[in-house]
Amino acid sequence: MVFRIASSPYTHNQRQTSRIMLLVLIAALPGVAAQTWFFGWGTLFQIVLAAVTALFAEAIVLSLRKQSIASRLKDYSALLTGLLLAVSIPPLAPWWMIVLGTGFAIIIAKQLYGGLGQNPFNPAMIGYVVLLISFPVQMTSWLPPYEIAATTPDMLDTLRMIFTGHTASGGDLTLLRIGIDGISQATPLDTFKTSLRAGHSVKQIMQYPIYSGVLAGVGWQWVNLAWLVGGVFLLWQKTIRWHIPVSFLVTLALCATLGWLFSPGTLASPQLHLLSGATMLGAFFILTDPVTASTTNRGRLIFGALAGVLVWLIRSFGGYPDGVAFAVLLANITVPLIDYYTRPRVYGHRKG
């Protein structure tokens, strides 16, 4: 009888990649539902387009690399990449944008590096940044939440807008972005930044309809809270660890609080930073990507804190209103260095 000894490591995680990805997709349901409620059917249509494109692009590359298509598509990683990109772009963005962004994310940012587990950068955020740099106007053309929108497109008009750029009555995106005050709307962070540049005071800005009676923007605070619910679910299921989201949110809140205390007339409040834009989505669903994040506990704390500082700096002093995507990619660059200096000590070996 021959006994074969498997090579190390001997510890084994019973959770398969497909189950982990499926849990993340399930955790995303509250956030997707909230975005659909406040911004319309476009969110769901973008997700469908992204999912189809992601699976198609993944299948093509796998076939070219002569790898098993069925087994790789069943790990749901391509679907998750498509979903994260789809919820990050405006719901009425032209159909070809989500197809282009998702295709770039899967083919260039993921498969070109060798596939799942080999990519150094978050594929969804690579796709997002490519679209943002290439098509800045379309990528910042968010609809106002239905509560302050003058016109809300129905399901068929949403489809027409995505595929033709016009509603049945001939309306376009410019018309749909008009709020109840008759002014074209933007996201809370975008509105804050552009209004400051226009010479408005923070006190004046906070009187705008998009901030009326809420902590961080009509609709957006509930969207962020919905993503937070999904993040708590992931923590409860032990799909992600607490280090990255907690260090990211605490650091972002600390930077925002200090900045707001020193310069309340030019910098956004902590609640606006925490409950606007892609804060909670980034904290629990993007930064926690096990492939592109730090792998040690101390490293995760540093990684999350670095991303928090970068988000605050970009939002406060950069040219883009949000900054989560850029912060994630910049933090991804530092992961090898962070992991090198936070390696746990190996006992029984002298320091070389």
From Swiss-Prot:
Names of the cofactor(s): FMN
GO cellular component: plasma membrane
GO annotation (BP), single: electron transport chain
Subcellular localization: Cell inner membrane
Main localization, broad class: membrane
N-terminal signal peptide: none
Presence of the UniProt keyword Cytoplasm in the record: no
Residues found modified as FMN phosphoryl threonine: 187
Source superkingdom: Bacteria
Entry keyword Hydrolase: no
Membrane topology, from the record: Multi-pass membrane protein
Family membership: Belongs to the NqrB/RnfD family.
Subunit details: The complex is composed of six subunits: RsxA, RsxB, RsxC, RsxD, RsxE and RsxG.
Function: Part of a membrane-bound complex that couples electron transfer with translocation of ions across the membrane. Required to maintain the reduced state of SoxR.
Protein name, UniProt field: Ion-translocating oxidoreductase complex subunit D
Taxon lineage: Bacteria, Pseudomonadati, Pseudomonadota, Gammaproteobacteria, Enterobacterales
Gene encoding the protein: rsxD
